[in-house]
Amino acid sequence: MTKKTLLFGCGSKWGLEFTKHLADSGYQINLVSSSSVDYPNVKTLNIDWVSSNETSVKELLVKEEYDLIFFNQNSGGGPGGDDFSPSRDYSVDHWNIHNWINCQLPYIVIKHLSSTITEKTKIGWMLTGLIVGNDTSRYQYAGYASIKSTNLHIMRGFSEFHKGIFFAINPIWFPIEDYKKDAEQISSIIERLESKDNGKSFMKDGVFWL
């Protein structure tokens, strides 16, 4: 039986390699992306992330039973760097846009598709090690880290109350020369996930993280 997946933000860079790997592995993919991807087994659902809203996202989604839903969209995030200095301000409007794209949109998606999610559906987020907060110099990525931290807790919240296997991945870093290897490795981690892994986060090599 063909597996179906719904991917967000996997239309370029490492994400595109991940999309191609899943497609080559037999997945039928609905790809929500600002990039148009012409590849076998991939249907692109084009989105303008910045102008998107709850209504447009719901209209875009195809309501069907997916084996995998994965959130890899990344608009960055602020404030950060010298946005904290007296001479600079960070736009609250931009701040809100980042929160919408990265945190609120996945929440809306899961709620909208709730009736199609089963105990075996895998729902994942791409995170970052910045959320741990041990390195005090990383305040320069404060907005980005806060978005990823929010997603960790959203993932855990759903794992407590919703059907499905909810998880997250810490990619550490994606060197261009390792795109293919990392795509294969993360795909392998996802394939092995079971109900006992619900609510957990893993490093990209499969080691338990948080």
List where the protein language model places each region:
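Rossmann-fold cofactor-recognition segment
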Residues: 39-53
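Conserved hydrophobic beta-strands of the Rossmann-like cofactor-binding core
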Residues: 4-7, 69-74
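N-terminal Rossmann NAD(P)H-binding glycine-rich loop of SDR-like oxidoreductase domains
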Residues: 10-21
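Catalytic loop of short-chain dehydrogenase/reductase
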Residues: 75-79, 84-99, 107-108, 114, ...
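C-terminal helical subdomain
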Residues: 164-172, 176-210
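Residues in the short beta-alpha loop(s) of Rossmann-like NAD(P)-binding domains
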Residues: 11, 35, 129, 172
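Conserved glycine-rich Rossmann-like NAD(P)H-binding loop of the short-chain dehydrogenase/reductase
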Residues: 26-38
